[in-house]
């Protein structure tokens, strides 16, 4: 009885091991299939057919863990005789058959892992080999047309080994030119070799050598691209330009120059037509005179005729913007002397400035002093016209009332007029220069008549009003002198 029970338990253990070995064999056969999703061919003696198996799927483990039982296999479900008969034939094989079946069952897990890892490694290696193969094919295709690899530099330089020894180990595949007939022209930047190399001209050495894109020697210079000027001479000093032998570019000339008072300041050339050597390099010497302005506009009322004549002699012949010329023209028109046409004529000569008596005045020192004086004395054209009209309107009113016309102040000896022009009276009250220029006899106000009253209050008020109209601070004036307009007003009041 006990022997029968032991044999039954032994048979059950043997059958379980046999089923595991068969399941491992079926799994190994399945992994050998390369196509994913192909049906697994079931053994004719077994009913294990889980259907389609997918790689890395969790349902496969469930199918393998619970296989379908085969009809010819031993199972504890079958009772008594069937179990004993089927197992007896299996046990007839002895321990040898059990050992042969036990070996694959014991190494089944290791074989399964090795097979899976081998399959994975082979799949990844196939992809890597395939990518490397494709890359190799692409390189071979590109190697057939060498100009496509580096078309910008291909055959643009001579092959040094070929030039030295006449042979090259690369042969036709060499990307350098074997002779001048293979040399290609390289497309360069528009500014290639148009600017100086800073490194070479600073330390005398350039690490790029002949491949540098900037100028090392004078013979490498190329013409600048159209539409833009090269800044090589601007970036470096005159020393580098003279060292390389490049011609020095002329400085651009300015066509307009504004003084601090907001009006164009004139600059006349010397009579010879050439600039002095000292003024050649100065920035102000390269400013040409504006056509509608004159440096002689800074003269006072005593020299208004001289300044207007010199202003009218400009090449443009346009009316000047100086206040004194406008006042002189207004005076000539009101009094009917006919001198305005002569003064404002385009070709009217300046006899006063060309005479010997003007040799010692302030304007004989050249245009530099006149350009400095101009911003101090220049007035706006509107203010000059309004002031002149107001002055002569008051004079006409006095004449209509039966008063005698005021005595004209004597002109200084230096102010000589042309032969065809009469001496127009000049209003001295609104065109008087500040006192800082009163050292010169030209800028002094004409002396007031001896019979004028010395009204200090009117003098001070007049100086303040004139200073406010001119827009500049009126400096301290000589208290012993009076403006002629206030002297005439005091006479008319009496």
UniProtKB/Swiss-Prot annotation:
ZnF (C3H1-type) residues: 153-181, 191-219
Motif (RNA-binding): 153-158
Start and end residues of each stretch annotated as RNA-binding: 170-211
Annotated Gene3D superfamilies: Zinc finger, CCCH-type
Keywords attached to this entry: Cytoplasm, Developmental protein, Disease variant, Metal-binding, Nucleus, Phosphoprotein, Repeat, Ribonucleoprotein, RNA-binding, Zinc, Zinc-finger
GO biological process: 3'-UTR-mediated mRNA destabilization; cellular response to epidermal growth factor stimulus; cellular response to fibroblast growth factor stimulus; cellular response to glucocorticoid stimulus; cellular response to granulocyte macrophage colony-stimulating factor stimulus; cellular response to transforming growth factor beta stimulus; cellular response to tumor necrosis factor; definitive hemopoiesis
Modified residues (Phosphoserine): 57, 125, 490, 492
SUPFAM superfamilies xrefs: CCCH zinc finger
GO cellular component term, pick one: ribonucleoprotein complex
Pro residues bias spans: 406-415
Stretches with biased composition (Low complexity): 416-435, 459-478
One of the record's GO molecular function terms: zinc ion binding
Effect of residue 308 to A: In OZEMA13; uncertain significance
Magnesium keyword on record: no
Protein location: Nucleus; Cytoplasm
Assembly mode: Associates with the cytoplasmic CCR4-NOT deadenylase to trigger ARE-containing mRNA deadenylation and decay processes. Interacts with CNOT7; this interaction is inhibited in response to phorbol 12-myristate 13-acetate (PMA) treatment in a p38 MAPK-dependent manner. Interacts with CNOT6L.
Disease: Oocyte/zygote/embryo maturation arrest 13: An autosomal recessive female infertility disorder characterized by embryonic development arrest and embryo implantation failure. A frameshift mutation disrupting ZFP36L2 have been found in a patient with acute myeloid leukemia, suggesting that defective ZFP36L2 might be involved in the pathogenesis of certain types of hematological cancers.
Protein name: mRNA decay activator protein ZFP36L2
Naturally occurring in which organism (per UniProt): Homo sapiens
């Amino acid at each position: 009885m006990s022997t029968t029970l032991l044999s039954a338990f032994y048979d059950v253990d043997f059958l379980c091991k046999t089923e595991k070995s068969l399941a491992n064999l079926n799994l190994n056969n399945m992994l050998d299939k390369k196509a994913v999703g192909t049906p697994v061919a079931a053994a004719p003696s077994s009913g294990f057919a889980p259907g389609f198996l997918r790689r890395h799927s969790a349902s496969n483990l469930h199918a393998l863990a619970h296989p379908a039982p085969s009809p010819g296999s031993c199972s504890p479900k079958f009772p008594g005789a069937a179990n004993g008969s089927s197992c007896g034939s299996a046990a007839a094989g002895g321990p040898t058959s059990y050992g042969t079946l036990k070996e694959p069952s014991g190494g089944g897990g290791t074989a399964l892992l090795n097979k899976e890892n081998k399959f994975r490694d082979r799949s990844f290696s196939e992809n890597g080999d395939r990518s490397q193969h494709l890359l190799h094919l692409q390189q071979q295709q590109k190697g057939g047309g060498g100009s496509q690899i580096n078309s910008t530099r291909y055959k643009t330089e001579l092959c040094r080994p070929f030039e030295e020894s006449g042979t090259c180990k690369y042969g036709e595949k060499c990307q350098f030119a074997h002779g001048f007939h293979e040399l290609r022209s390289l497309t360069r930047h528009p500014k290639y070799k148009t600017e100086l190399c800073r490194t070479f001209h600073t330390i005398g050495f350039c690490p790029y050598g002949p491949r540098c894109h900037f100028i090392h020697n004078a013979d490498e210079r190329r013409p600048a691209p159209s539409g833009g000027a090269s800044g090589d001479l601007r970036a470096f000093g005159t020393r580098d330009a003279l060292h390389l032998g490049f011609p020095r570019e002329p400085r651009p000339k300015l066509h307009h120059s504004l003084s601090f008072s907001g009006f164009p300041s004139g600059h006349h050339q010397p009579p010879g037509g050439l600039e002095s050597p000292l003024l050649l390099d100065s920035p102000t010497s390269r400013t040409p005179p504006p056509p509608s302005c004159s440096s002689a506009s800074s003269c006072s009322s005593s020299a208004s005729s001289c300044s207007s004549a010199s202003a009218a002699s400009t090449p443009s012949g346009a009316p000047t913007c100086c206040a004194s010329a406008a006042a002189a023209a207004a005076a000539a028109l009101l009094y009917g002397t006919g001198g305005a046409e002569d003064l404002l004529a385009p070709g009217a000569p300046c006899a006063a400035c060309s005479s010997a008596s003007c040799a010692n005045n302030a304007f004989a020192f050249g245009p530099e002093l006149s350009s400095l004086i101009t911003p101090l004395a220049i007035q706006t054209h509107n203010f000059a016209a309004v002031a002149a009209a107001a002055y002569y309107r008051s004079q006409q009113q006095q004449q209509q009332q039966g008063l005698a016309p005021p005595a004209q102040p004597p002109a200084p000896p230096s102010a000589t007029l042309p032969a065809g022009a009469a001496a127009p009276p000049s209003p001295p009250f609104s065109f008087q220069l500040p006192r800082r220029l009163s050292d010169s006899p030209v800028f002094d106000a004409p002396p007031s008549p001896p019979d004028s009253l010395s009204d200090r209050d009117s003098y001070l008020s007049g100086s303040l009003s004139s200073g406010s109209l001119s827009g500049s601070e009126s400096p301290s004036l000589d208290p012993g002198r009076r403006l002629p307009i206030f002297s005439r007003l005091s006479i008319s009041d009496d």
